[in-house]
Amino acid sequence: MNRKKLQKLTDTLTKNCKHFDKFEVKCLITLFYNLVGDVAERPGVVTGLDRNVFRNILHVTFGMTDDMIMDRVFRGFDKDNDGCISVSEWIHGLSLFLRGTLDEKMKYCFEVFDLNGDGFISKEEMFHMLKNSLLKQPSEEDPDEGIKDLVEITLKKMDHDHDGKLSFVDYEKAVREENLLLEAFGPCLPDPKSQMEFEAQVFKDPNEFNDM
């Protein structure tokens, strides 16, 4: 991408970006095109990060390991649901991912955890997500029992209207009372160390990012 195009794109994306300044947006655009590769300049080809490339970034850079959660994070970034992350989706997604307010992060995490998109986190959804985070003990007759117990404990803590599922209102109230519950069903945001390392590297020289 030539300098003029890059400058124009930077100006456009900075206008709609809450948490990055112009220099940071420029670095993230440069990184995006480094990750996408040569396809960027081909006419008629949709430019974007596909699911595999994006999941690799989540895994290698931000230490995420849960396939289900990584898939949901991809969907959270891919707002137009076209199967790849465009440069504007990349900037807006990272703005929240790295520097979002508590309100923004609550909305994002809830959408990640609401696996079927019906506006609630059901017992079944909790079970699926928590199952991946618990180690099975070989001595247990029914390893799912421990997970079912954990679901019940979580509901008791977070289900304020006692309807057997979590609405956003339930979730928000619980998280405001105890911030640690933000990622109650699995890590879907970077930990502070990964975030600092990513920002230090990318906002210094995005061209060296792949050497990390």
From Swiss-Prot:
Binding site for Ca(2+) 2: 114, 116, 118, 125
GO molecular function: beta-tubulin binding; calcium ion binding; calcium-dependent outer dynein arm binding; cytoskeletal motor regulator activity; dynein heavy chain binding
Protein name: Calaxin
Gene designation: Clxn
Assembly and oligomerization: Component of the outer dynein arm-docking complex along with ODAD1, ODAD2, ODAD3 and ODAD4.
One record GO biological process: outer dynein arm assembly
Function: Component of the outer dynein arm-docking complex (ODA-DC) that mediates outer dynein arms (ODA) binding onto the doublet microtubule. Seems to regulate the assembly of both ODAs and their axonemal docking complex onto ciliary microtubules. Regulates ciliary and flagellar motility and is required for cilia-driven determination of body laterality.
Ligand binding (Ca(2+) 3): 159, 161, 163, 165, 170
GO terms under cellular component: 9+2 motile cilium; axoneme; cilium; sperm flagellum
Matches recorded under InterPro entries: EF-hand-dom_pair, EF_Hand_1_Ca_BS, EF_hand_dom, Recoverin
PANTHER family reported in the protein's UniProt record: CALAXIN, CALCIUM BINDING PROTEINS
Domain EF-hand: residue ranges: 65-100, 101-136, 146-181
Subcellular location: Cytoplasm, Cytoskeleton, Cilium axoneme; Cell projection, Cilium; Cell projection, Cilium, Flagellum
Pfam families reported for this sequence: EF-hand_1, EF-hand_7
Keyword field: Calcium, Cell projection, Cilium, Cytoplasm, Cytoskeleton, Flagellum, Metal-binding, Repeat
Residue sites binding Ca(2+) 1 per the record: 78, 80, 82, 84, 89
Record note on disruption phenotype: Mice display typical phenotypes of primary ciliary dyskinesia, including hydrocephalus, situs inversus, and abnormal motility of trachea cilia and sperm flagella. Strikingly, both males and females are viable and fertile. The 9 + 2 axonemal structures of epithelial multicilia and sperm flagella are normal, but the formation of 9 + 0 nodal cilia is significantly disrupted.
Species the sequence originates in: Mus musculus (Mouse)
